[in-house]
Amino acid sequence: MNENLFATFITPTILGITTLPIIMLFPCLLLTSPKRWLPNRIQILQVWLIRLITKQMLTIHNKQGRSWALMLMSLILFIASTNLLGLLPYSFTPTTQLSMNIGMAIPLWLATVLMGFRNKPKISLAHFLPQGTPTPLVPMLIIIETISLFIQPVALAVRLTANITAGHLLIHLIGSATLALCSISVTVSTITFIILFLLTILELAVAMIQAYVFTLLVSLYLHDNS
């Protein structure tokens, strides 16, 4: 049992060398390219999920926004794979690190904003000042809209970090309680084990949902600037 509750969120190392890059590249092994004319069931499921997500996210985009299809699909598959990887025993979830999530959010957000200022600068600047704003409120609204714009990538990263971290903490706490109650009451420990099992199933759904939410928000930022 870990002495520190947050020890599971410390970046693992081997001989002082971080293993985070290896963990981040591991999901690529799960998405192999087909070697036969007839794909297996896993590959059929992958293609079906990619087509479904692509249809839902890219319907609102124009031709320029749809050029991001490969980026968005790679993003959602990467985040979902790393989230699910962290649910395995003795594993590590890279998305619990705020630095990594900010490193993903800021470049994507900045790319959409720069694309908006390059393609339609007047419309992008108009977002800072809604139409019909009273003159005394103009400076205040510009400051508020500017702050809200720069908060977007931070909120994107914090949302993913908080949801994944909270779920792992709950699993850790309930798992520790289950082990402690085994020597006290078998009935109570069985109930807590059932709760732990149901919570693990919920975390599987949360891992997929958070990957979808992160990618969907990036897609909405892209839609606003394309």
From Swiss-Prot:
Keyword Ion transport: yes
GO MF, any single term: proton channel activity
Annotated localization: Mitochondrion inner membrane
Protein name stated in the entry: ATP synthase F(0) complex subunit a
One Gene Ontology biological process: proton motive force-driven ATP synthesis
Principal location listed in the UniProt entry: mitochondrion
Complex formation: Component of the ATP synthase complex composed at least of ATP5F1A/subunit alpha, ATP5F1B/subunit beta, ATP5MC1/subunit c (homooctomer), MT-ATP6/subunit a, MT-ATP8/subunit 8, ATP5ME/subunit e, ATP5MF/subunit f, ATP5MG/subunit g, ATP5MK/subunit k, ATP5MJ/subunit j, ATP5F1C/subunit gamma, ATP5F1D/subunit delta, ATP5F1E/subunit epsilon, ATP5PF/subunit F6, ATP5PB/subunit b, ATP5PD/subunit d, ATP5PO/subunit OSCP.
Task performed by this protein: Subunit a, of the mitochondrial membrane ATP synthase complex (F(1)F(0) ATP synthase or Complex V) that produces ATP from ADP in the presence of a proton gradient across the membrane which is generated by electron transport complexes of the respiratory chain. ATP synthase complex consist of a soluble F(1) head domain - the catalytic core - and a membrane F(1) domain - the membrane proton channel. These two domains are linked by a central stalk rotating inside the F(1) region and a stationary peripheral stalk.
Originating species: Osphranter robustus (Wallaroo)
TM regions (residue ranges): 6-26, 68-88, 97-117, 138-158, 164-184, 193-213
UniProt xrefs under PANTHER family: ATP SYNTHASE SUBUNIT A
Keywords: ATP synthesis, CF(0), Hydrogen ion transport, Ion transport, Membrane, Mitochondrion, Mitochondrion inner membrane, Transmembrane, Transmembrane helix, Transport
Annotated GO CC locations: mitochondrial inner membrane; proton-transporting ATP synthase complex
Membrane topology qualifier: Multi-pass membrane protein
Protein encoded by which gene: MT-ATP6
Recorded catalytic activity of this chain's protein: H(+)(in) = H(+)(out)
UniProt family annotation: Belongs to the ATPase A chain family.
InterPro entries given in the database record: ATP_synth_F0_asu, ATP_synth_F0_asu_AS, ATP_synth_F0_asu_bact/mt, F0_ATP_A_sf
